[in-house]
Amino acid sequence: MAARNTARKRAFQILFEGDQRGADVLTVLADWVRHSRSDTRQPPVSEYTMELVEGYAGRAERIDELIAQYSVDWTLDRMPVVDRNILRLGAYELLWVDATPDAVVLDEMVQLAKEFSTDESPAFINGLLGRLKELKPSLRRE
């Protein structure tokens, strides 16, 4: 499943870039797709990356509400940008992508935190996404 792992990493990078630039993630996604088509050195943006980014974008407000509600002692603005965007991606895939097992989502997001964030972040990511997983049936409302 290396392709899915890469797709998640690229989706995270797109969400991160959008957050850093204050740009809409769909605009950033379109930029990535356009760039990958015009520069043969860039790998194409996979369908799954597009699905993740577009899915998050369609539920961004609800996802941010959930993260804010269940992150103890952290507001979205105070969270490290990396953690905030790993949580956004993880919350979307956990709650709305039924084809991916919950344990896989948690593991993949923890791995992203290990690669891109602080030493404390993997436990924070795992704890918050684990809580969302427990409450999943009641959280899927639109």
From Swiss-Prot:
This is Transcription antitermination protein NusB. Signal peptide: none annotated. It comes from the Bacteria. GO terms for cellular component: cytosol. One of its GO terms (molecular function) is RNA binding. Gene3D superfamilies: NusB-like. It holds the Pfam family NusB. Belongs to the NusB family. GO terms for biological process: DNA-templated transcription termination; transcription antitermination. Keywords: RNA-binding, Transcription, Transcription antitermination, Transcription regulation. The gene is nusB.
